[in-house]
Curated annotation (Swiss-Prot):
The lineage of its organism: Bacteria, Pseudomonadati, Pseudomonadota, Gammaproteobacteria, Enterobacterales. This is Major cold shock protein. It comes from Klebsiella pneumoniae. It is found in: Cytoplasm. Coiled coil: none annotated. GO terms for molecular function: DNA binding.
Amino acid sequence: SKGFGFISPKDGSKDVFVHFSAIQSDSFKTLNEGQEVSFTIENGAK
């Protein structure tokens, strides 16, 4: 409900920030805690 969160990579590396606008989905752009996802890291403006 915040519109953002963090993904914890399986390899134990640093958590990755994710914003809902970056989620590619045919339905609601939401992620659930514990859900496995595929992702590509991109640098964005901060």
